[in-house]
Amino acid sequence: MHFHTHLLYNTCEKYCLGAVFFYFWGVFLYNSLHKCKGFSFHVLLSLTEILKGCLATMNKELWIERANDSLVKHFYEQQSDIEQREGFESKLTFGTAGIRGKFGLGEGRLNKFTIEKLALGLARYLNAQTNNPTIVIHYDIRHLSAEFAQIIANVLANHQITVYLPDTYKTTPELSFAVRNHNTTSGIMITASHNPKDYNGIKVYGSDGAQLSTDASELVSRYIEDVGDPLQIDIPISKQNTSYIKPFPKSVTDDYMKHIQNMIGYIPKSDLQVVFTSLHGTSVPIVPKLLKSLNFNQFNLVEAQCKPDPNFSSVQSANPEDHRAFDQAVELAHKNDADLLICTDPDADRLGIAVRDVHGQITYFNGNQIGALLLNYRIQQTSQLRHRLMIQSIVSSDLTKSLARYNNVEYKEVLTGFKFIAHEIRQLDDYQNMIFAFEESYGFLSDPFVRDKDAVQIVPLIIKYASELKLYGKTLKDELEQIYQTVGRHEDTLFSHTLEGLEGKKKINAIMTKFRSNPPQEIQGLKVKAIEDYLTSEVYQLDKDTTSQINSPKSNVIRVLFDEGFIALRPSGTEPKIKLYVSLKCPNFDDVAQKINAMIFS
């Protein structure tokens, strides 16, 4: 019984008078339970929930009183009752990818107060890590990105942390480069990538330009939680402290472009025509400026989509994985007889491509196919190097691994999340040459002067590749077919299942438990060779009946290996979703993949 009394006290402690009242109310209930035989444990729990509801109402009222100062009153007023309630009944958590969420009131939403809380926790973390910390802050074109950047800068400056803040939006890869180039302690990118317009987020980077490691993220999270109630934060702004906020040197952007120019060298002259769209994001003006500096002018912008717009007004989807993101680019390509279509997501860390043939037929490429093409080109470009290495995520295609093996290129597989790729790059020996890294979710890196996905450096690289092919009367589609002929037609697909509520959570857990406790001998006629469990860091070889260790951080992922490829199951840590990845080299791939999906989720 003491636990529930203590729970009441903890729930109420931020409101002192309420805490005292509810604490003694809990004591009263506790005594009543002992003295009154008819007074049940369930009554106590019910009353506890009622009191928690009262507290939630008090909490909501306090937030509404501060709505005018929150920066998000407009967003809150546009939300449904359920969405509003979620903001008060949940809490934003700082995870391995930082924080991402909707605008609104409450600790479960992004607003002035929750941003101040995050910034204060981060300031304490940085000051605990080193003397005189420095940081670069970049932000994208989303609603409140610039305002959040200024709030964070003010809080950090108030704690004597030197902040470099640009006067305009920037791309995510530029942030990674800036941290490394300017030798700062940390970096912050304010973005929500391709999420809807009412989302934003904050990603934190370490001194190597990579997103924080799991351990560092957990430590930052504890510092943020220790701040307490965001409505109680008082951040005095003084002229002396704001002197810690410095203008971001424009020379850093110039250096970033020079690195890409040196990587590309030149783009061969051909009659290749390109259509490019930034999907209202940050890659314009830097990408057009970069292409022109490389003397490539044969491109047309989707003008309506190349203007920064936090509402993403002219796109159905700002996600390069979604073919709808290309709709206006396709129209322009038909009009101009273009060969290659390229789009980047709003923070320019991911990229999608499509090609148009002489008959006007559009072919879209998935992330694994783009990865295979880029790896193939990098293998051609680096033939003079020894000890070449390619890095990819564990759910990316076997196609690229086969291509690497065929060309005597070493490969490594890491957990999903580009910070794990960055970690591998950091661990490289001097003699190793990392020539390419990617994730199937359309994130690519050719040269590791950046330690995150970088669509900006990939745009001129893919154009150079396509331009070379055009000189020989070939296309990227032809080149992919040649890769298939060389190493086999590995094909890939992804099934994403949303399973809401308690029953959905039970089903997800049951699926994962079944594969762990009773692994199948075969799936749709494919003989299972091994089961890799990244939660236990073990791999079970079915044919040998042996278990060995996986040298990897823990993650709730299961991968089933066949001679023909693999399938992988990966539940989301933040949403009621589970993803099934299928990567196989077999006849009737689409039919087999659909049957595997039906078997697992029926």
Regions found by a protein language model. Give the residues of each.
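Conserved phosphate/anionic-ligand binding catalytic regions in large, soluble enzymes, centered on
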Residues: 90-108, 278-286, 438-443, 448-456, ...
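An N-terminal, well-structured beta->alpha segment
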Residues: 60-152, 159, 245-272, 282
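N-terminal small/polar loop signature for handling phosphorylated ligands or for N-terminal nucleophile
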Residues: 136-199, 296-352
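Gly/Ser/Thr-enriched, mixed-charge loops and adjacent short helices
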Residues: 83-92, 200-327, 332-333
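Phosphate-binding and adjacent anionic-ligand microenvironments
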Residues: 334, 338-340, 361, 381, ...
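N-terminal amphipathic/hydrophobic targeting modules at extreme N-termini
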Residues: 10, 14-15, 20-21, 31-33, ...
